[in-house]
Amino acid sequence: MAIEPLSITRPTPPPTPHPDSPAGPAPALLCLPYAGGAAGAYHGLRGACGAVEVVAVQLPGRENRIAEPPEFSVPRLTDEIASHTARPYALYGHSMGARIAFEVARELRRRGLPPPLRLYAGAAHPPDRRVPLAATADLPDEAFIDQLVRRAGAPEELRDVPELRELLLPVLRADFTWIKRYRYAPEPPLDVPVVAFAGLGDAEVPPGDMLGWARHTRAGFALRTLRGGHLFVRDGSAELARLITADLAGPGPGRGTDPPPVQDDEIHVRVFPADEPPGTPGSDEGGSSRAADRAGGSSQAVDRAGGLAVEATVRGGAVGAAVGLPAAYGAARDAAHGASPGAGRGDGPGDGLGPGEWEQLVDAAEEDRPWLELRARTARRALARAGAHAQAAEGFPDLAAPGPWPADDGWQVTFLPLHTPLGEALAAVAEPRGRTRLSADVWTDR
């Protein structure tokens, strides 16, 4: 399997390394394309990554390998990528490419070869989750193309330009067949930090879905949300390059001592052990928004439950945070046996269930009740700790809605499903509506 290194210049010096980052030469960034994509998709990163050498993997059936059948295999890709492992390197895969990069990293581990410094996953469902678009692989051409244009950012010209359709359709069919046939095989999590990049306007793989990548590492996880849609790597490469080069120069996801600077439209969430020593971010007691003015005018909220802590940081304004595990509450279990809610039920200020929420619990399938209750209670606690007015007495109208949930007085609640060494958990962050870009650092050490 051939690999086509991109010819790059080095007009800027290497980024200043963090004291905890690996010493030595600047790393290579090995990039795997999205379905239907090719090495050329990464030309935008070439001039934006400074001293980081961008190496784009060319899959068969595209660009300079157009004459080859468009099928590939992970073992053959790993054979060629292995030649780059003698120097520091990182893997980046976008959409389908992220799933390929994940499997390449696992195959390198099986072979006892040096692991990447990072696994970067862009706009991709976690490998243990189904890809909804995979169902389009068997559709007739017109319907297949329509789905890709509407949902995956494929060019409109695919509908109307016969030459482009003739060129790309065999590659797209082959790639989506690979996605459809892919089966995740459980193995221990990677000892490689994982950084997931989501597109703010990507309805196919929203940022919350990408938090599931935390299940697949025990070396730290981060999520960053970029402006753009599903193919932000094509249209927003400068921002992506800035985040990657800064990360490679730093200590790794979740290893810093301060939250990253947040912008006006951004909220940063950090998840860490509740017994983290004093003096580190989020180590103060309490759960109020504290509106503590930090550097740059940012405010912070902290909450603890079940051995976990969550810290939310915004720039300006107020913010509230809450975290919990499903086993922490008993109303869902009571509902299974026909109990009534009673007055003032709830384990903390502001998190009692409303009558409408209780009715939803009673009507829900028994296995869904703990999570639905957790969503209602954490949402209410986050709002209360932000200083927002409590939700209307009836409660939230749809506990199964993905969020953000609109709340009273112009507030909203965003949920983060968490995958931590203590098990599955849920964080809720309350903020004024309009602050939409999520970034997160999640503790995953086992």
Segments from the language model and where they lie:
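Domain-scale detector for complete catalytic domains at protein termini or as standalone homologs
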Residues: M1-Y92, R99-R255
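Catalytic nucleophile loop
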Residues: G93-I100, P326, D334
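Aromatic-acidic/polar surface patches that form glycan- and anion
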Residues: H94, V233, W371-R375
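Short connector loops at helix/strand junctions that flank enzyme active sites
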Residues: S95-G97, P114, D191, A305-G307, ...
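Core catalytic alpha/beta fold that binds nucleotide/phospho-ligands
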Residues: G252-Y329, R333-R446
